[in-house]
Amino acid sequence: MRVLASAPAKIILFGEHSVVYGKPAIAAAIDLRTYVWAEFNNKGAIKIEAKDIKVPGLTVSFSEDEIYFESDYGKAAEVLSYVRQAIELVREEADKNGNGVTVSITSQIPVGAGLGSSAAVAVATIGAVSRLLGLELSNEEIAKLGHKVELLVQGASSGIDPTVSAIGGFLHYEKGNFEHLPFMELPIVVGYTGSSGSTKELVAMVRRNYEEMPEVIEPILVSMGKIVEKAKDVLLSELDNEVRFVQLGRLMNINHGLLDALGVSTKKLSELVYAARTAGALGAKITGAGGGGCMYALAPEKQSEVATAITIAGGTPMITKISDEGLRIEEVLP
């Protein structure tokens, strides 16, 4: 028996950093997917085949007798620890620890770009292996197992990434509680800088500033929380999509300015953001912790132009859209 499952990447639409201080955030699944085949093996072991885990920005240098790989392959290896924990958790849940399982991974999601590649591979693995072992789990139950995987590997996790990946669509998050928001099409372009910042260090930097200047930083965080609630109102409204696009774009631009004020933007991120806006995006902002990673732009009828502008500015564009589907069982073969 073989099972194929897939799970999507995610972006934080609004609320990164302020969510650490109890403010709400909105995240969404996007139509870039990780695919996991699962099947039994007769060795009683866990075997992981990573076909094409993507590490963008690969640079290879050649000298007379050596080849230097200048990419962080530690990030790709880190993904495999999520896969192993996911398989072990599902085998425990199914009480089938002795079963050998082989998983084969292919992915459209770049590693280390802040798009939830680790959560997607964990969720897809849980989905495929649970079906293989005859364990019937809802997507909500799979999201909880995905959160448990993150806790085991990372030591801390809000649960946003695996929940969005398992359930799909838009999720409003506040103080540990999730609310699924109505779906609407958002034509977006994600731009990757080619580098990633340390979430831990960036969160610590904002914390230092908050502790030293609470009267300055607190109003910024409050404003970011209000942006999230306004964005939620827009998503819940029955206004025409064109009107909602314009309103969401304005909120994105304001949110980016506040993130810049917190010090988490970089020259490259700002270049991609402003290139996207100049090319016709209604809004563009950082998604995730900042310090590198990705931005995203809302670009109805302008995705190609915005993608070209991001490329010219030195980024890697990914034309995509919000995915209403989370985890999918794609195929089951006897």
Swiss-Prot record:
A GO molecular-function annotation: magnesium ion binding
Domain of life: Archaea
Main location: cytoplasm
Positions with a binding annotation for ATP: 110-120
Active site: 161
InterPro entries: GHMP_kinase_C_dom, GHMP_kinase_C_sf, GHMP_kinase_N_dom, GHMP_knse_ATP-bd_CS, Mev_gal_kin, Mevalonate_kinase_arc, Ribosomal_Su5_D2-typ_SF, Ribsml_uS5_D2-typ_fold_subgr
Subcellular location(s) of the protein: Cytoplasm
Catalytic activity as recorded in UniProt: (R)-mevalonate + ATP = (R)-5-phosphomevalonate + ADP + H(+)
Pfam families linked: GHMP_kinases_C (PF08544), GHMP_kinases_N (PF00288)
Recorded metabolic or biological pathway in which this protein acts: Isoprenoid biosynthesis; isopentenyl diphosphate biosynthesis via mevalonate pathway; isopentenyl diphosphate from (R)-mevalonate: step 1/3
Family matches, as PROSITE patterns: GHMP_KINASES_ATP
Required cofactor names: Mg(2+)
GO BP term, pick one: isopentenyl diphosphate biosynthetic process, mevalonate pathway
Protein family: Belongs to the GHMP kinase family. Mevalonate kinase subfamily.
Classification via PANTHER family: MEVALONATE KINASE (PTHR43290:SF2)
NCBIfam families per the UniProt record, alphabetical: mevalon_kin, PRK03926.1
Quaternary state and interactors: Homodimer.
Official protein name in the record: Mevalonate kinase
